[in-house]
Amino acid sequence: KNLPLIEEYNMKVAIENHCDLWSDEVIWMIEQIDHPLVGACLDTMNAQNMMEGIASCIDKMAPYTYCCHFCDTKIIVDPDGVHSYGCTLGEGSIDLIRVMNTLRREAPPELDTIDLEIEMPLSMYTLEVGREEEIKAMRKSIQYLHDVLDVGIRGR
């Protein structure tokens, strides 16, 4: 029903593996729609939160990925249970080198957006301290993307 509209504007649509959607479900929808402007939005944190297995999710979704929410997470076990929260790239539990290598090897040319997301547990900070921590994490993450994953423009 909406395909003519996305065709009119030549607008890509990426279906995300969100916190309630497995990679197989995303792929099924994309294959049912079967349109070159419809692909996947791969979220590395959601793959972990769904306990799907990050490597398996990346391998399945990479060939369909038009957009990636590139995140890292820390797993914390405490008396209240098991929790995950976003952190600076390279400081968490996700093998981001493998993720980037898989995307470089398997993703279609339509992959044109890698969105850096850091979902920090800001409730433990004041607003001012939380902003400072977010900026610090973002700067370190950009440095990680540049130095470790070879993302970005050289010489900057």
Protein language model regions, located:
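Histidine-acidic metal/acid-base catalytic patches
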Residues: S23-L37, C41-L42, Q48-R156
